[in-house]
């Protein structure tokens, strides 16, 4: 479930948000529970739960969901939402229903969650495009490594990985054959092509390959598997490496993809985009119990304002210094 909702990492699932929404759309005096001598109304339940952390986050989630649906709903088709949902269901297979239940989700609430994430993702990506500069391209180019042809073996424990490393580094060793035999990868795949901005392998593995020369073999690269929370160990050999062109513009399209990916994954940038959307929607908190749910986005605005003020102060200070030096020079003359 994490893949589809990473842009909303600080917000809980829509399941709780729907509960709050139901409370708000039902008469406050409607009885939820009846018993001898007493009843529990919607109002009782709302007042009892609204100050809890889960309700605070649920309300935030509901606000963000509504705002982005209003501002960007036409940009993401329902078909795309369904496709993303079906893809997730396929990945989980027979355990999908259990995974939903464990996350406190239903089919409908999970689809809403996916859609909210996709709407935020769209907005963040569009905002990132508007901020692209030649400086961004040049910075990305500096650390960019063009396509590499590699052979990679994956091991489940460090001791075995070190033993395999000794084998593949032995004189005359056939790396590909050993890698194929020893790898614990489910598909037994060892041949890969990627550049430094690719994501088909863990970032640390790609980084290790990027630093190798053609024909070189890496040391053992340890990577924490986010799915199992267990370390996996990789050894990579670069068999072919494209020569890097001196003009960054040759890779402009690819560099754009890399820069946009970095920006859209940046939490501060995401928060800035969400803050702007909330400001445009003129969100007003009527119940003081929820007064602080947008604080993280208000802080984003303050940070940006503070940064701009700092830059302005630095410029003013620099200009004042120049004026002072100029006046001193004229006085000396």
Swiss-Prot record:
Query: Which residues lie in Basic and acidic residues bias regions?
Result: 312-322
Q: Which HAMAP family match?
A: Foldase_PrsA (MF_01145)
Q: Which stretches does the entry tag as region Disordered?
A: 301-333
Decide whether keyword Membrane is in the record.
yes
Q: Could you list this entry's UniProt keywords, alphabetically sorted.
A: Cell membrane, Isomerase, Lipoprotein, Membrane, Palmitate, Rotamase, Signal
> Briefly, what is this protein's role?
Plays a major role in protein secretion by helping the post-translocational extracellular folding of several secreted proteins.
> Which Gene Ontology terms describe the biological processes this protein takes part in?
protein folding
Give the subcellular location. Answer: Cell membrane
Which Pfam family, just one, is annotated for this protein? Rotamase_2
- Any one annotated GO CC term: plasma membrane
Please state what class of enzyme this protein is: isomerase
Per its record, the protein catalyses:
[protein]-peptidylproline (omega=180) = [protein]-peptidylproline (omega=0)
Signal peptide range in chain numbering: 1-22
Lipidation positions, renumbered (N-palmitoyl cysteine): 23
Membrane protein topology class: Lipid-anchor
* Compositional bias per record (Low complexity), positions renumbered to this chain: 323-333
Q: Which family does it belong to?
A: Belongs to the PrsA family.
- Would you tell me the protein name for this molecule? Foldase protein PrsA
A GO MF annotation of the entry reads:
peptidyl-prolyl cis-trans isomerase activity
What cystine pairs are annotated? none
Keyword match RNA-binding: no
Q: In the Enzyme Commission scheme, what number(s) does this protein have?
A: 5.2.1.8
For this UniProt entry, what is the primary localization, expressed as one broad class? membrane
């Amino acid at each position: 479930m994490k893949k589809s909702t990473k842009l909303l990492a600080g917000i809980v699932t829509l399941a709780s948000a729907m509960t709050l929404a139901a409370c708000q759309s039902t008469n406050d005096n409607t009885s939820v529970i009846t018993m001898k001598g007493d009843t529990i109304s919607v109002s009782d339940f709302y007042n009892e739960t609204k100050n809890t952390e889960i309700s605070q986050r649920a309300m935030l989630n509901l606000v963000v969901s509504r705002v982005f649906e209003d501002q960007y709903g036409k940009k993401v088709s329902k078909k795309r939402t369904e496709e993303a949902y079906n893809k997730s269901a396929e990945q989980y297979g027979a355990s999908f229903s259990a995974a939903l239940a464990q996350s406190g989700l239903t089919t409908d609430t999970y689809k809403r969650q996916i859609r909210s994430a996709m709407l935020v993702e769209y907005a963040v990506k569009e905002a990132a495009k508007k901020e692209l500069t030649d400086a961004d391209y040049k910075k990305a180019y500096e650390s960019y490594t063009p396509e590499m042809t590699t052979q990679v073996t994956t091991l489940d424990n460090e001791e075995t990985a070190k033993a395999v490393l000794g084998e593949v580094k032995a004189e005359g060793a056939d790396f590909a054959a050993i890698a194929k035999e020893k790898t614990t990868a489910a598909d037994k795949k060892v041949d890969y092509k990627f550049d430094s901005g690719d994501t088909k392998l863990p970032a640390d593995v790609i980084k290790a390959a990027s630093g190798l020369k053609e024909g070189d073999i890496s040391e053992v690269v340890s990577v924490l598997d986010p799915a199992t929370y267990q370390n996996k160990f990789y050894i990579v050999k670069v068999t072919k490496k494209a020569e890097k062109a001196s003009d960054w513009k040759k890779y402009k399209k690819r560099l754009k993809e890399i820069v946009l990916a970095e920006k859209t994954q940046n939490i501060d940038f995401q928060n800035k985009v969400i803050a702007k959307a909330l400001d445009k929607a003129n969100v007003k908190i009527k119940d003081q119990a929820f007064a602080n749910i947008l604080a993280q986005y208000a802080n984003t605005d303050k940070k940006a304002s503070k940064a701009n003020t700092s830059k302005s102060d630095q410029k003013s200070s620099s200009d004042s210094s120049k004026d002072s030096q100029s006046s001193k020079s004229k006085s000396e003359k």
